[in-house]
Amino acid sequence: MFIFLLILFVCILLLPSCARADEAPAAHQRRSLQSLHDAFSSAANSQYAYSIAHRLATDFHLHNNATYGGRQAGSDAEHAAADYLADEMRRIGLSDVEKAAAKCDKWQFNGASFTVNGKEYPVYTYATASTVPEGITAPIVYVGRGTMYDYEGVDVKGKIVLVDIDQRADWWITYPMLEAEHQGAAAILAANVGGFGQVADDALNSQDICGPTSIPTCSIGVRASREIRAQLPHGTVLGTLKVDNTVEIGKGTTYNVTGRIRGKSSEFQILLGGHYDTHFWGFQDDCCAVGLVLAAAKAMLDSGFEPENDIVFCLHGAEEWGSSYTQFDWTVGAWEMINTLHPEWVGKTLAFLNFELPAYEFATYTTTYSAPEMFSLLRDFTTRYPYAPKPQGCFPDGVLTEGYQTYTYSDDFSYYAAGVPSTVNGFLLQKDMEHVHPFYIDYYHTQYDTPDTYNDAVMAFNLRYYGALAIYIDQMPALQLDFTAQYTRLKDALDADIFAQSGADAALYRSVVESLLPPAQALKTRIDTLNACYLAADEAGDIVEMARLRQAGRPLIRKVLNAFRYCQKYLLGLMYERPIVPHQAPQETIALCQHIIDCLVRHDPATAVDQYVATVNNCLESYSIYFSPAVIDTLNDMNWGAGNQDNLYFGTNINFDKAEVEEASRSVYQRRAEIGGDFAKEIRVYRDAIDMEKKKLRADVHKETEAIGWLKDLLG
């Protein structure tokens, strides 16, 4: 704080006299930053945001099913909503309104029912197969959690299986579905006994499927499941499942609806966005975000805001699901937008401010997830910028600014991976970045995500806060991307012991990373000084100096955007769904495999299973443990099959390469109770995996070391 104030004081001393500003021609008069923010805040109308969200969530014409809603990728309802949103953008005065068509797989849930002994039970589908119009009438079989072990001695061929599922503690619906198909079942119904849909015992839940269309797959309420299960011990129970679910591969179109406020220059732009496709009614997720984005646009227009750069408002389709037979089947509309429709937005977009569920008070605090390079920007805006709004009537502990890495669960990650600085309001994870907020256990992706969850104080704060953030980024002459955060990220990714075991050059890696710090610090100082001088000029009313500083900032903006794109292209990886530095995947796998070997050498398979086996390959070995090899073959083909590499979306070119330990994982689990057993075969598999992972580690470190050297030059 002292350094910031010192810079500001020096800038004030260096400013030309205020008299010169007073004598400037009238044509050059400019609104002060305070007046811009005051005008926006006065015009920001949370009730307008609510009205948009309410209509999107309750208008039956904007949903595919009158009973349970749903506005899926490429569906009639999604197209109707796109038309409505484009019309609303034009009505409030945005220019260049467009429905940008993007490819997707089409999913339209028209309806479903499940009848047992004359009683109909509500069900809701995933992006999976339909039944024939007359439905499937077959015996119902309960198979526990739906693992391969639950089918032992059970004949389910041609039958409807009923399972319990906890998609947070155990696995996604994909795996019980594929197991049921592998075992010959005709359809599967899943009751959420934990993880999601806990708000009520009749709650239904839908998610992306991360798999093929497979067999008809539906969510059923826990109470309904219990009623049906109670009948099973008394003899064969027949059920009739009818599913009208359109899933068309390669035949869908989703629309990303955009409008803009033209800036004084169109060289750069700022993007505000949310998504309008939904599971069920989707009031919070993500109708409220759409309302917020349009309310921000309307407030800027109504306040007479004239931005320096274009402000683009983009409402994405196909966020919840958009493609079959891929692990990365969500945020498809956004991925297509930045990679196919507008790749030129990379290097042009100063920031993408994304929104998810922005009208719910998740905790006593709020956060913003972002690229690490944006941590300083968010911290300085929140704690130092005099016009940053504070929460009123919500979030009593304020806005936390410790820095929270954006994750893969929202549209901003597709932009981030492509090279666009991106943020999203803190909507999912608690501040430990491990546990989710209770909303996700209870309401998320259920029919209970309705206007009853609305909190106007939260909507009003998020509208004012992020609208002010957009204005701040627009007005500052230099974009405050801080590559000392990238330095910290790379430094913290080093495990010197694993490097040494693998023959990777830890000293060289450390040296190159350390060489990144001085130019990163110097660039940060240049940016901070320029922006501080701009604030001082604004305070003094010196519009001539402000114009000069803005011109001086343009080369810095180009520099940091180029460096940011470079960082994500060469230094961002994914381990399943977790953002990493690429070498962290083999580094982590080596350590885990060595722990497992140590346990097996001690004849202690129980500890190996309890602590390590399931965590290899991020979490994928937990699936290998519980599901048939044929199921895992499908998982592997979706992620690493040569014929599916053009179907990975935000995982393209950054997905990790898994260790081949499935057979050993399954074997150790099945032998976990053995005492004094011979695990030589399993140990050999893990040792072979370590040898392969060491090669991967050396290759990754070599690439990263070279890339960091080039990054240093880009920052200098």
Question: Where in the sequence are the language-model features?
Answer:
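Bacterial Sec-dependent signal peptides at the C-terminal "C-region" and cleavage site
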Residues: L15-P25
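Soluble metallo-hydrolase cores and metallopeptidase-like ectodomains found primarily
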Residues: S35-H37, K119-G153, Q207-F283, L294-E306
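Second-shell loop/turn segments in exported
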Residues: L36-A44, L62-D76, Y142, D164-M177, ...
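Noncatalytic luminal/extracellular "stalk/propeptide" segments of secretory-pathway proteins
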Residues: Q47, H54, T58-I160
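Extracellular/luminal Protease-associated
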Residues: S75, Y124-P216, T401
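Acidic/histidine-rich catalytic neighborhood of metal-dependent amide-processing enzymes
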Residues: R168-Y175, E179, N256, T278-F375
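Active-site-adjacent substrate-binding region
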Residues: G252, P358-T488
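C-terminal non-catalytic alpha-helical accessory regions
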Residues: R464-Y465, I473-G716
